[in-house]
Each structure stands twice: as C-alpha cells, then as structure tokens.
Amino acid sequence: MESEGWPALQPLLCFAWIAATLPIIAAALPIPTAVGGHLLRRLLSAFSSRGKTVRPSPASSSGSSSSKAKFTVPQKYFMHFYVVGVLATTILLLAIWFYAYMKLTPLLLESSSYSTIFSHLVGSNSFSFGRVRSRTMGHKYRVWRTVFALLLMEVQVLRRLYETEHVFHYSPARMHIVGYLTGLFYYVAAPLSLASSCIPEAAEYFQGQVPEFVVKGRARMPDLVIDSSSLLQPLLKLGWTQWIGAVIFIWGSLHQIRCHAILGSLREHKDSDEYVIPCSDCFNRVSCPHYLAELVIYFGMLVASGAEDIPVWFLFIFLITNLSFAAVETYNWYLQKFEDYPRSRYAIIPFVC
C-alpha cells in the first residue's frame, strides 16, 4: 500500500540489492581474463577484504602498503555496522508497532471466520462484504508480520553489537573502505526491506498526526494509553509460518553464538597478530560455519516475514552471494597460510561450496 508523496520504496530497494549483488556474481563466474574477468575478481577481492585477507604481504613495498592503508579502516569499526543496524531497526520497529497498535487492532480472528461462513450462506452481497473484510484482515496480518520480523532483526543486531564488544578481540588488521560502506548500507537496507510494504502507510499515519498536534496543541490531544495485552496479543495470534521462522532463527542464532565463541577464543591477546586453525563444532566440516549460521538466521526472518515482499528475497540473495564469496576467499587464505589445513573442508555449505 503506497501512500501519495512517497517514492516507490520497494523498487528502489530491489534495484539497490541487485546493484550490490551483480558484481559479486560476475566475479564468481569464469569470465576470461581477456575480457577483464581476472581484474574484476581482484577488485572485488580487494574491496571485500578485511582482517587477515587485507593485510599486505611482507614483500610489498612500504609505498604500496601506505597507499593501501589510505583506503582502509580499522577492523574494529565493525561495531559501526551494528550501531547503525540497531538505530535503523529500532526506529522502524517502534514506528510500525505503534502504527499497528493504534490503527490495526484487534485482529478479531473469530469474527472474521464467522463472517466468511455467513457470507456463503446468505448470498453474493454479503460474500462481497466478506471478501472486503478478508482483505482488511490480510492487511492487518501483513503489518503485524512485519512487526514480528523486525523484532527478530532487532534481536540479531543487538546480539551482534554485544558480541563485537565482548566476544571478539580484533587484531590491528584493517578492512577496505568499500567493504565498510557496504556494511553500513546493508544494516540500513536490511530493516528497510523487511518493513518496505508498511513504511509508506505508517509514514502517512504519522504525517497526519503532526498537523493535528499543531492545530490542537498538546493540552487538547487525547491522552495516550497503551494496553500491554493489546500490544502483544496480535503477535501471539500470527500463523504457524511466523513461529516456524522464529524457530529457524533461534537455531541459527544459537549456532552462530557457538561459532563466534570459538573464533573469539582463538585470540586471547587482543594485540596478537597470530592466526590459528579453528576446530570443533561445524568448523570441522566448513571453514566459515558462522556465515552458514547467518544464512540460516536470515532464512528464518524471510519465513517469518511471510516471504511476500520482493526486497526481502533480494536481500537474502545478496546475503548468499556475499557470504559465499567471502567464505571462499577465507578458505583460500587458510590454504595459503597453513600447509596442514584440511582440504576436505568446504567453504560455507557442506557438499556444495
């Protein structure tokens, strides 16, 4: 439901995700060197490099090293991603939740079911009314599903913010500025994509409240009373799809917590430059199980959102291509760094990649 005065948000988000995904896909394709395939792969590897994969080799000249450093930022800037993600997600969550509470409650499941049965019994006019009511109910569910998906996103970015501060011990390594900007883009565009179908109407609602506040003044505005049961009950009445998505999300989150704890324990001294081969858990099967867990987490969000909004699908496609490319780069780095690195391990997905 697009409101007047708002741009077509969903097409813009789709375009942004496609623009971010296509270079990664192109770099992964076997494009001949003669037409720039090797150059494209090198550029994308440089832009996406961070940590252990970005540091110049000892053989590189000091001039080359300083030139590279101009286009990098400290890897500890990862925290900026999650600060931005928390801010963007919290603002959208509170705004859409408040809009849903004020305008789209209660859900009235039972009356909707009875009205549908009644419409079949009494004739076409009532049936038409039932269809309108059904569309209204469907719209309500769509907005409350968005609130549910944003709640999952909020949990994700808050956890990642905590882990960045208390679990990971970042080395003095750096990451490319393009990768840094991509991360900032991602943590703004991801919650926007989850909420894209509801943002225009929620914005229209708040825009309508501003003139009313200006005309009436605070003293003559009705008191705001929030009923906690009405605030939460619609979320509890959502369908099985949302709860299946939540279970997938929780499983992926628990697995990623375990993987991050293993990675964080590999460098006890924060200033240490030494890398070791991670073992145990799924590290024995794939090089980047924390990336695999990230895919599971966002697949859970996709399911919980209802999988009806195209930008969410493009978000997930970008995540698959981006994390797969990064995992292959990490896997290749491990092979070059450690002679005894297990070649039986996959990069990210067992038996696939």
Curated annotation (Swiss-Prot):
Function in brief: Plays a key role in early steps of protein N-linked glycosylation by being involved in the conversion of polyprenol into dolichol. Acts as a polyprenal reductase that mediates the reduction of polyprenal into dolichal in a NADP-dependent mechanism. Dolichols are required for the synthesis of dolichol-linked monosaccharides and the oligosaccharide precursor used for N-glycosylation.
Pathway this chain belongs to: Protein modification; protein glycosylation
Keywords: Cell membrane, Membrane, NADP, Oxidoreductase, Transmembrane, Transmembrane helix
Cellular component GO terms held in the UniProt record: endoplasmic reticulum; plasma membrane
Residues of the signal peptide: none
Catalytic reactions on record: a di-trans,poly-cis-dolichal + NADP(+) = a di-trans,poly-cis-polyprenal + NADPH + H(+)
Protein origin, superkingdom: Eukaryota
Enzyme class: oxidoreductase
Its EC number(s): 1.3.1.94
Main subcellular localisation: membrane
Cellular location(s): Cell membrane
GO biological process, one term: dolichol-linked oligosaccharide biosynthetic process
Pfam families the UniProt entry points to: Steroid_dh
Organism: Oryza sativa subsp. indica
Transmembrane segments: 11-31, 78-98, 175-195, 234-254, 291-308, 313-335
Similarity field: Belongs to the steroid 5-alpha reductase family. Polyprenal reductase subfamily.
Protein name (Swiss-Prot/TrEMBL): Polyprenal reductase 2
Membrane topology listed for this record: Multi-pass membrane protein
Single GO MF annotation: 3-oxo-5-alpha-steroid 4-dehydrogenase activity
